């Protein structure tokens, strides 16, 4: 017997029992996006490698350690996208939809990073991202956060996520802070681990992200970025905080929050949870006003965020188990006897015409009535329609409510209206 081929480590299959919940969650998210006027953009999963190096930063964990990069047959370096913002900006520039325009976009799909697989973190994972172009005020930053807060309420997880905010200022402000931080780190070289020593000169702000508890204690005495903010960034941040407070959104200022990608400026934020064990990020983003110009477009203010769907699904399952997938089907169509199969197919198509939202499954493969009713239960049907030879001859169908066992025999022309009532 040939050896079975398994899925790649960290790249998971999602079976129908799982995808039903995914679909309900995604549909809930999309409904909110539509309510805020955001439009979908669909992007390739493979991009030219220089796109991510320029956008994310060459001295980042993502570019240095985590990207799936390969040469194609022409010798061009390509990369499976590790995140969605860079590709969205590239598409906006390429198709001319950013210059002097306001765009509110969203996308969803798989991303790829070579990481150690663990609960909620995989090598192929799914993100839903939102990007806004052409608006630079704190009000649009606030709207993005308000929209995510609405998601948490819709999904029933609002009490299990907390908002952390910071401002990392302008490029000049970060340059001044970088000098102060490097000077502090140099004074404590002997207390830094190998990873922090490597980052100290290449990307010192990333030292603030260390998971080493001893260095975290050391950093309590480090300079704080907010002390180096330029006036415009400080005013922007204060205005954002006021908007959130007036909107009833509680938050904590986290001076160590810098995000792992180099393209951010001013506002950065994360929604975090402790309901999945150690604190983890559910959704994160911020402003990246320089990226469009950096990638060859005209200077365009921009802000956005991305949310990991695997972690979101785990959180919903953990803290709101009542948020369940919708039943597999509404109606199961049962038939038995000569000529009933064709009649069942014809009836099913007429019902789909009359009730476009109806989820109807027709029994195939035979079986007596008992077996077919068992299949109806398996698929979670709420109503069974039964066609036997007598019903076909009379132009009728038996309609059975599977929740209470009540049934009636109706003319086929009346079945659609009865189903609409039963399933309302």
Curated annotation (Swiss-Prot):
Major subcellular site: cytoplasm
Name of the top EC class for this enzyme: ligase
Protein's cellular compartments: Cytoplasm
InterPro entries xref list: aa-tRNA-synth_II, aa-tRNA-synth_II/BPL/LPL, Anticodon-bd, Anticodon-bd_dom_sf, His-tRNA-ligase, HisRS-like_core, HisRS/HisZ, HisRS_anticodon
UniProt KW Nucleotide-binding keyword: yes
Domain of life the protein comes from: Bacteria
A GO term for molecular function: histidine-tRNA ligase activity
Keyword list, A-Z: Aminoacyl-tRNA synthetase, ATP-binding, Cytoplasm, Ligase, Nucleotide-binding, Protein biosynthesis
GO biological processes: histidyl-tRNA aminoacylation
GO CC annotation, single: cytoplasm
Reaction(s) catalysed by this chain's protein: tRNA(His) + L-histidine + ATP = L-histidyl-tRNA(His) + AMP + diphosphate + H(+)
EC number of this enzyme: 6.1.1.21
Assembly and interaction partners: Homodimer.
Family note: Belongs to the class-II aminoacyl-tRNA synthetase family.
Protein name (Swiss-Prot/TrEMBL): Histidine--tRNA ligase
């Amino acid at each position: 017997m040939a050896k079975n081929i398994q899925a790649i480590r960290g790249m998971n299959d999602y079976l129908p029992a799982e995808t039903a919940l995914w679909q309900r969650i995604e549909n809930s998210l999309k409904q909110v996006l539509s309510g805020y006027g955001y439009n979908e953009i669909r992007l390739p999963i493979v991009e030219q490698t220089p796109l991510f190096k320029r956008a994310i930063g060459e001295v980042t964990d993502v570019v240095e350690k985590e990207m799936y990069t390969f040469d194609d047959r022409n010798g061009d370096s390509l990369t499976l996208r590790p995140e969605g913002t860079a590709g969205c900006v590239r598409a906006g520039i390429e198709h001319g939809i950013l210059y002097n325009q306001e765009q509110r976009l969203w996308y969803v799909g798989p991303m790829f990073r070579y990481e150690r697989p663990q609960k909620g973190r995989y090598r192929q994972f799914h993100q839903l991202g939102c990007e806004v172009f052409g608006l630079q005020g704190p009000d649009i930053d606030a709207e993005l956060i308000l929209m995510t807060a609405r998601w948490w309420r819709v999904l029933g997880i609002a009490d299990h996520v907390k908002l952390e905010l910071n401002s990392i200022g302008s490029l000049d402000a970060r340059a001044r802070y970088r000098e102060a931080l490097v000077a502090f780190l140099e004074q404590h070289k002997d207390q830094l681990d190998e990873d922090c020593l490597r980052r100290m000169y290449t990307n010192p702000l990333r030292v603030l992200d260390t998971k080493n508890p001893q260095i975290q204690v050391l950093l309590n005495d480090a300079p704080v970025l907010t002390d180096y903010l330029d006036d415009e960034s400080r005013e922007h941040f204060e205005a954002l905080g006021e908007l959130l407070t007036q909107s009833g959104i509680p938050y904590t200022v986290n001076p160590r929050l810098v995000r792992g990608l180099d393209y951010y400026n001013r506002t950065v934020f994360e929604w975090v949870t402790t309901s999945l064990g150690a604190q983890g990020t559910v959704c994160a983003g911020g402003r990246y006003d320089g990226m469009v110009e950096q990638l060859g477009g005209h200077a365009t203010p921009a802000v956005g965020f991305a949310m990991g769907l695997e972690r979101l699904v785990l959180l919903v399952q953990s803290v709101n188990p009542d948020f369940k997938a919708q039943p597999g089907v509404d109606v199961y169509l049962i038939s038995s006897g000569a000529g009933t199969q064709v009649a069942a197919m014809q009836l099913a198509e007429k019902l789909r015409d009359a009730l476009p939202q109806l989820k109807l499954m027709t029994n195939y493969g035979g079986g007596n009535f008992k077996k077919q009713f068992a299949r109806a239960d398996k698929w979670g049907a709420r109503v069974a329609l039964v066609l036997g030879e007598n019903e076909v001859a009379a132009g009728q169908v038996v309609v059975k409510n599977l929740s209470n066992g009540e049934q009636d025999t109706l003319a086929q022309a009346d079945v659609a209206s009865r189903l609409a009532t039963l399933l309302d």
